[in-house]
């Protein structure tokens, strides 16, 4: 018979300890740790719908409301949700991210780039394609396409400044809060294990 040594591998310990400690947290704190990325995704979806609406008004697009609103809500939601989960929540819960500033910075970057800027940039080709298809707005000739879209996009970026900053601040706060909740969970005493 082989002597069976207990696993002292750091990864095994972390994968066993962190989920067990998180289960000891109150339900509201546990939900924030587990579903925080969905909140970031929902904010990104709302940002996508707002950007879609602003571009539709500027380009005078009145047809295909659902055809443009559906991808402008679903794609930013999925992108921001999965990115925040991959870059912030998952590394936190596996012990690969152990610095509050790092967590806040990652959350801020995901919130700004994928929750704020990405929905605005995604709205440009969606609504540009609809404007070309329904001929609701005169589109530029080949030489000045870039200048045309910059001119069209400036008012949208100005109006989307507050939602983008709000998304960025919320993602930074959520990253910091998730880190503090994880530290709180790790400081909880070990539950009494009954020996049978």
Curated annotation (Swiss-Prot):
GO biological process: mitochondrial protein quality control; mitochondrial respiratory chain complex I assembly; optic nerve development; protein insertion into mitochondrial inner membrane from matrix; toll-like receptor 4 signaling pathway
Membrane topology: Multi-pass membrane protein
Function: Protein required for the cotranslational protein quality control in the inner membrane of the mitochondria. Associates with newly synthesized polypeptides and may act as a chaperone that cooperates with OXA1L for the insertion of newly synthesized mitochondrial proteins into the inner membrane. Required for the assembly of the ND4 module of mitochondrial complex I.
One Gene Ontology cellular component: mitochondrion
Subcellular location(s) per record: Mitochondrion inner membrane
Family membership: Belongs to the TMEM126 family.
Designated name of the protein: Transmembrane protein 126A
Record InterPro entries: TMEM126
Entry keywords, A to Z: Membrane, Mitochondrion, Mitochondrion inner membrane, Transmembrane, Transmembrane helix
Mitochondrial intermembrane topology ranges: 56-57, 128-159
Membrane-crossing residue ranges in chain numbering: 35-55, 58-78, 107-127, 160-176
Gene field: Tmem126a
Mitochondrial matrix side: 1-34, 79-106, 177-196
Subunit structure, as described in the record: Interacts with OXA1L; promoting cotranslational quality control in mitochondria.
Pfam families attached to this UniProt entry: TMEM126 (PF07114)
């Amino acid at each position: 018979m082989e002597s069976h040594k207990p696993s002292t591998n750091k990864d095994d310990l972390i994968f066993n300890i962190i989920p067990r400690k998180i289960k000891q947290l109150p339900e509201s704190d546990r939900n924030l740790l587990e579903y925080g990325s969905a909140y970031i995704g929902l904010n990104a979806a709302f940002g996508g719908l707002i950007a879609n609406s602003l571009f539709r008004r500027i380009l005078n697009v009145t047809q295909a409301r659902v055809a443009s609103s559906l991808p402008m809500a679903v794609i930013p939601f999925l992108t921001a949700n999965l990115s925040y989960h991959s870059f912030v929540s998952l590394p936190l819960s596996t012990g690969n991210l152990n610095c509050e500033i790092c967590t806040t910075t990652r959350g801020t970057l995901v919130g700004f780039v994928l929750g704020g800027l990405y929905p605005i940039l995604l709205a440009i080709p969606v609504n540009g394609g609809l404007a070309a298809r329904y001929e609701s707005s005169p589109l530029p000739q080949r030489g000045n396409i870039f200048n045309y879209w910059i001119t069209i996009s400036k008012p949208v970026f100005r109006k989307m400044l507050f939602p983008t900053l709000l998304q960025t601040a919320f993602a930074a706060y959520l990253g910091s809060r998730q880190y503090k909740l994880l530290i709180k969970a790790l400081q909880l005493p070990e539950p009494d294990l009954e020996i049978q």
